[in-house]
Amino acid sequence: MIASIRGIIQSIGIDHLIVETGGVGLLIYAPRSTLNAVGQIGSETFLYTLLIVREDALTLYGFSDPAQRNLFEQLIGVSGVGPKIALNLLSSGSPDEIQKSIAGGDIARLARVPGIGKKTAERIVLELRGKIDLRQLSGTTPGNVSTLDRELTDILISLGYSATEAAAAIAALPGDAPPTLEERLRLALRYFGSA
């Protein structure tokens, strides 16, 4: 497996770039966010990569960070989601935003991505929702989680929801949610359709 590439950018296309390393130009498909961040033609770049071996092709995919690559691997593991659809989804936002959409069951947001219809979006949510730990995302690291939200998580878990479901409900709270535990609990239960 080729885990990473360092080399000189030879060209940048709509969905790919060519990186020369060791005298060989490698065609690497990448999400738009990665293509926008790699630099200019002629500059050195570093990409985390994933090599997909098929019967008729060896295809290399590049990412700006390991989180993108890991999410890509999860996405292509979903039935009906190939590399092209996974790249389209990764091009629609940061890995954290996409994972929050999946954990929160935001089918409408996922279905807006080219190549993903409502059924595919539902399948992505169904297959990946339980695999995403929102507490590990950059915007919701334990240091950024308020005491109030920790208490709310504990209450939701005691009511029978999983830690992932509780984190998804808290992530779905509006930014201007009331600062009282009771109101936040009411909003979180409404997220589950229980209130």
Curated annotation (Swiss-Prot):
Sequence segments annotated as region (Flexible linker): 143-151
Protein name per Swiss-Prot or TrEMBL: Holliday junction branch migration complex subunit RuvA
Localization, UniProt: Cytoplasm
A molecular function GO annotation: ATP binding
Example of a GO biological process term: DNA repair
InterPro entries, alphabetized: DNA_helicase_Holl-junc_RuvA_I (IPR013849), Hlx-hairpin-Hlx_DNA-bd_motif (IPR003583), NA-bd_OB-fold (IPR012340), RuvA (IPR000085), RuvA_2-like (IPR010994), RuvA_C (IPR011114), RuvA_C_sf (IPR036267)
Subunit field text: Homotetramer. Forms an RuvA(8)-RuvB(12)-Holliday junction (HJ) complex. HJ DNA is sandwiched between 2 RuvA tetramers; dsDNA enters through RuvA and exits via RuvB. An RuvB hexamer assembles on each DNA strand where it exits the tetramer. Each RuvB hexamer is contacted by two RuvA subunits (via domain III) on 2 adjacent RuvB subunits; this complex drives branch migration. In the full resolvosome a probable DNA-RuvA(4)-RuvB(12)-RuvC(2) complex forms which resolves the HJ.
